[in-house]
């Protein structure tokens, strides 16, 4: 018997949920659906019920679940050489480094594993650049972040958050952070002008995902870029959720026609098969960190490198940015046509969208998502009254229309 499968017994959803509650730390509040298998835009629970996936593991499976090309790359490389650590060179990483930098038009990549690691790495890079290149006085560097941001769960990252549920009773937090309103270039310039000699970086999500798919004013990111150039500050674009075709462009910052100083990638860079992340930037910034001063055992592994190249191939070869743009416009138009008192607003870009539920409506976003699941569609609330809707980018027009019908049916069931 396969030693792995011998440890995985046939259990009901109820049994598995209870088992997890007993033996795993309570860090999430999941919709009570237990995945057993997944393919493309669909997942199946342990009772074999099929669902449309409209969360995509927070946009980690843009290429669809278990894309055969990415799975094949993983299996082939895993059977050959999965891990070398960066103590030695390996055959695949140098080729991946060349591939991804040329793919996005940057000079260098720093490979990590999780999105939060990429964010932490960018903070270290920005600070180091500030001290070495800009001449900021030692231990005086400032990073600007936005209220409503979500960049991860590590101590450094939650220090940039203004959400008490992220940082409460985890202090002391990291110093050297100034938080400004998202979508306010006026506040950005005020802080930059007041602390011009101390600010090393401004980290921003092109669209705030966890905040509820908050789309800034047109041209916001371009103005931020111009201000950062004016005050000699690094613009760091967290594209971990918004990048890789999700919003209808390869990077969401492409909508503004800019090239951030640092770009952070994660999630869909592996097609959902492995934790892989990357920081892209110019040599002027990247080479401020010397050998032995930063790293990761698994970052840049042969396995991660092969998987990431396959995942990026799929995004481009299957024109997933174009599909996201076209179907996103169609989806928002269809959802906006649903006349229901609970729907306060529909917003988004590409296939990163959200329905804002009127907080005074008698049914919560959670209740609506539970009803979605009962009808074969999986989505998750964020910030109590917002439902994020982000299917794999491989979804078809016919499937989008099927899902719109499910969404309409669920809202209609709450009319009375």
Curated annotation (Swiss-Prot):
Cofactor: pyridoxal 5'-phosphate
Family annotation (PROSITE patterns): AA_TRANSFER_CLASS_3
Pathway given in the UniProt record: Amino-acid biosynthesis; L-proline biosynthesis; L-glutamate 5-semialdehyde from L-ornithine: step 1/1
Reactions it catalyzes: a 2-oxocarboxylate + L-ornithine = L-glutamate 5-semialdehyde + an L-alpha-amino acid
EC assignment: 2.6.1.13
Sample GO molecular function, one term: pyridoxal phosphate binding
Highest taxon above the source species: Eukaryota
Main location group: cytoplasm
Pfam families, alphabetized: Aminotran_3
GO cellular component: cytoplasm
Gene Ontology biological process terms from the UniProt entry: arginine catabolic process to glutamate; arginine catabolic process to proline via ornithine; L-proline biosynthetic process; ornithine metabolic process
InterPro entries associated with the record: Aminotrans_3 (IPR005814), Aminotrans_3_PPA_site (IPR049704), Class-III_PLP-dep_AT (IPR050103), Orn_aminotrans (IPR010164), PyrdxlP-dep_Trfase (IPR015424), PyrdxlP-dep_Trfase_major (IPR015421), PyrdxlP-dep_Trfase_small (IPR015422)
Residue numbers bearing the N6-(pyridoxal phosphate)lysine modification: 267
Family: Belongs to the class-III pyridoxal-phosphate-dependent aminotransferase family.
Record protein name field: Probable ornithine aminotransferase
Organism of provenance: Dictyostelium discoideum
Gene of this entry: oatA
């Amino acid at each position: 018997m396969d030693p792995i499968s011998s440890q995985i017994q046939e259990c009901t959803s109820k049994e598995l949920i209870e088992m997890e509650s007993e033996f795993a730390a309570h860090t999430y509040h999941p919709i009570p659906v237990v995945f057993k298998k997944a393919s493309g835009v669909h997942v199946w629970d342990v009772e074999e019920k099929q669902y449309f996936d409209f969360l995509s593991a927070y946009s980690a499976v843009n290429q669809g679940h278990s894309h055969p090309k990415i799975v094949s790359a993983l299996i082939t490389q895993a059977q050959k050489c999965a891990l070398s650590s960066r103590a030695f060179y390996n055959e695949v990483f140098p080729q991946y480094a060349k591939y991804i930098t040329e793919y996005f038009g940057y000079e260098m990549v720093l490979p990590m594993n999780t999105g939060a690691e990429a964010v932490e790495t960018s903070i270290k890079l920005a600070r180091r650049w500030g001290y070495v290149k800009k001449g900021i006085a030692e231990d005086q560097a400032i990073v600007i972040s936005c209220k409503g941001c979500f960049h991860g769960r590590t101590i450094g990252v939650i220090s940039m958050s203004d959400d008490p549920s992220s940082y409460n009773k985890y202090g002391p937090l990291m110093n050297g952070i100034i938080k400004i309103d998202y979508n306010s270039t006026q506040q950005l310039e005020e802080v930059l002008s007041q602390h011009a000699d101390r600010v090393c970086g401004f980290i921003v999500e092109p669209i705030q995902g966890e905040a509820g798919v908050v789309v800034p004013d047109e041209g916001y990111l371009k103005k931020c870029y111009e201000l950062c150039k004016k005050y000699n500050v690094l613009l760091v674009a967290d594209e971990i959720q918004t990048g890789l075709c999700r919003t209808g462009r390869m990077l969401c910052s492409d909508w503004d026609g800019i090239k951030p100083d640092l770009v952070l990638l994660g999630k869909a860079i592996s097609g959902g098969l492995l934790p892989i992340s990357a920081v892209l930037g110019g040599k002027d910034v990247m080479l401020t960190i010397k050998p032995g001063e930063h790293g990761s055992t698994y970052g840049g592994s042969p396995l991660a490198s092969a998987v990431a190249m396959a995942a990026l191939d799929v995004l481009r070869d299957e024109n997933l940015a174009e599909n996201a743009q076209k179907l996103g416009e169609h989806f928002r138009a269809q959802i906006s046509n649903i006349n229901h008192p609970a729907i306060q607003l529909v917003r988004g870009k590409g296939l990163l969208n959200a329905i804002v539920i009127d907080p005074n409506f008698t049914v919560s976003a959670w209740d609506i998502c539970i009803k979605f699941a009962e009808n074969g569609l999986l989505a998750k609330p964020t910030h109590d009254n917002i439902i994020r809707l982000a299917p794999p980018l491989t979804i078809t027009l016919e499937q989008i229309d099927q899902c719109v019908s499910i969404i309409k049916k669920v809202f209609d069931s709450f009319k009375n």
